[in-house]
Amino acid sequence: MPVCWILNESGSFVVALLWLAVNAYLFIDTFFWYTEEEAFFYTRVILGSALAWARASAVCLNFNCMLILLPVSRNFISLVRGTSVCCRGPWRRQLDKNLNFHKLVAYGIAVNSVIHIVAHLFNLERYHLGQAKDAEGLLAALSKLGDAPNESYLNPVRTFDMGTTTELLMTVSGITGLGISLALVFIMTSSTEFIRRSSYELFWYTHHIFVFFFISLAIHGGGRIIRGQTPESLRLHNVTYCRDHYAEWQAAALCPVPQFSGKEPSAWKWALGPVVLYACERIIRFWRSHQEVVITKVVSHPSAVLELHMKKRDFKMAPGQYIFIQCPSVSPLEWHPFTLTSAPQEDFFSVHIRASGDWTEALLKAFRVEGQAPSELCSMPRLAVDGPFGGSLADVFHYPVSVCIATGIGVTPFASLLKSVWYKCCESQSLPELSKVYFYWICRDAGAFEWFADLLLSLETRMSEQGKAHLLSYHIYLTGWDENQAIHIALHWDESLDVITGLKQKAFYGRPNWNDEFKQIAYNHPSSSIGVFFCGSKAMSKTLQKMCRLYSSVDPRGVHFYYNKENF
């Protein structure tokens, strides 16, 4: 089992462990530096350990804010993914988990933000207490520094009469910190799966608060409220001796009044590179959005599915890739991902869009396909296209055996792959590595995806004519059927074609037994590397991951299942 787990999970584990290790190192190193550094001795007198907690979490925040934009820079990831020299094997598959890493980094930002905020609330209160009338000793002496000429202050709170909330809102750091916190709350809460499923538009718009987040982050340290002793002051002012003789600071030559300065802001240095990279990403998207997209065909399918055929200058794709589509007449800002359902051999590229939210429903209305004939092509809404981008499905042809599994509308990514196989068979081209494809499709009603059943029928016919029927083995499972359908199916069971799908391969009714399926595939292909590709529900994804681990051989010479899930 450990070997089987390593096949599919080791890469993700190593990445997560490395990320955690860097965070731990930065936090611990910074924490102890601020705990022991002599320049911050007097600062610690006022703030105590909260100083180290605030600064350590700040460094980790800077590190994670540096990383957060990289996983969503699609063109950068596609560039790296296409560089086989830099990205091979299991590490290439990690690029397909970019959104998982994006979420992991976001959790890191959230955790460190909470630590940072709580620590600074303690700091603010302790600064405030330092100006209290009953404050005494070294604490009072340090808090009063800055009142006399030629003195620099250590305590940014200059009076006890003003409340801590007012003090917070009177500083650059306080205002920007509040803005950063609110932006983070909006972004995190709107990123829950429930919000993304029920109102993708809310998720999309609130995520663009990141612009305000990074601007506030860049100037957050400009207030320099955390101050330490200057190097010149440390040279003249012996902290070890002078801390016990604070009453003599004004008179004793050995203990001149300590001078303090704020630390130079550094957050912008951490974020500058990724922000510039992401700015280039958005410029590329803007440029692509203004390239002309010609809609050549519109087809309305059952169950509110819209098929669009398009052309665009210099558009080159590979099987399994996806694009982002914008329709300015529906929303001038929103971009939505859709997998390509056309093959590279075709002179157009296509997508199938199902109405499953406000934006897609509005798009279908814009094309007037709800119960009406498609619009004339000249009156079609303008579309902008960004992409294509590579996903995990692009690796189907890199395995000798590939198992493709889809549920419901998740079948669309496999249309391009199967079409590509179909064209290669038509052109008598060989598939260098791929020798067998197992395709599983689980849906409630095949009629809802009539277009895909037609594709399978064409593929089945062509491959049979070419004598390559052995290359593809497909299994359709229908989960939505009633008693009347069952009787109808039973009466026509002996017919050569399936009564529901019209295919030679009979459909199954219910759900597949994955233990039996994986056991049979492992038996059919001993000593093979088998790629398992899935697009569908999270629950089934967990089941398939478990099957890949369970049926991968411990023996390096045995069968190995490599799990890949399509993510947007």
UniProtKB/Swiss-Prot annotation:
Main location: membrane
Keyword Transmembrane helix attached: yes
A biological process from GO: temperature homeostasis
Phenotype of gene-disrupted mutants: Mice display balance defects, a tilted position of the head and abnormal performances in motor coordination tests. This is associated with the absence of otoconia in both the utricle and saccule of the inner ear.
Record topological domains on the Cytoplasmic side: 1-12, 71-103, 189-201, 417-568
A Pfam family annotated for this UniProt entry: NAD_binding_6
Chain positions carrying an annotated carbohydrate: N238
Expression sites (tissue/organ): Specifically expressed in inner ear by the spiral glanglion neurons, the vestibular system and the sensory epithelial cell layer of the saccule. Weakly expressed in skull and brain.
Enzyme class, UniProt record, top EC level: oxidoreductase
Regulation: Activated by the ototoxic drug cisplatin. Activated by NOXO1. Cooperatively activated by NCF1 and NCF2 or NOXA1 in a phorbol 12-myristate 13-acetate (PMA)-dependent manner. Inhibited by diphenyleneiodonium chloride.
Enzyme Commission code: 1.6.3.-
Domain Ferric oxidoreductase per the UniProt entry, residue ranges: 55-284
Regions that span the bilayer: 13-33, 50-70, 104-124, 168-188, 202-222, 396-416
Keyword line: Cell membrane, Glycoprotein, Heme, Iron, Membrane, Metal-binding, Oxidoreductase, Transmembrane, Transmembrane helix
PROSITE patterns per the UniProt record, alphabetical: FAD_FR
Ranges of the Extracellular topological domain: 34-49, 125-167, 223-395
FAD-binding FR-type domain: residues covered: 285-395
GO molecular function: heme binding; metal ion binding; superoxide-generating NAD(P)H oxidase activity; superoxide-generating NADPH oxidase activity
Membrane-topology descriptor: Multi-pass membrane protein
Keyword Repeat: no
Catalytically driven reaction(s): NADPH + 2 O2 = 2 superoxide + NADP(+) + H(+)
Modification after translation (UniProt): N-glycosylated in a CYBA/p22phox-dependent manner.
GO cellular component assignments: cytoplasm; NADPH oxidase complex; plasma membrane
Quaternary structure note: Forms a heterodimer with CYBA/p22phox which is essential for its activity and cell membrane localization.
Name the record gives this protein: NADPH oxidase 3
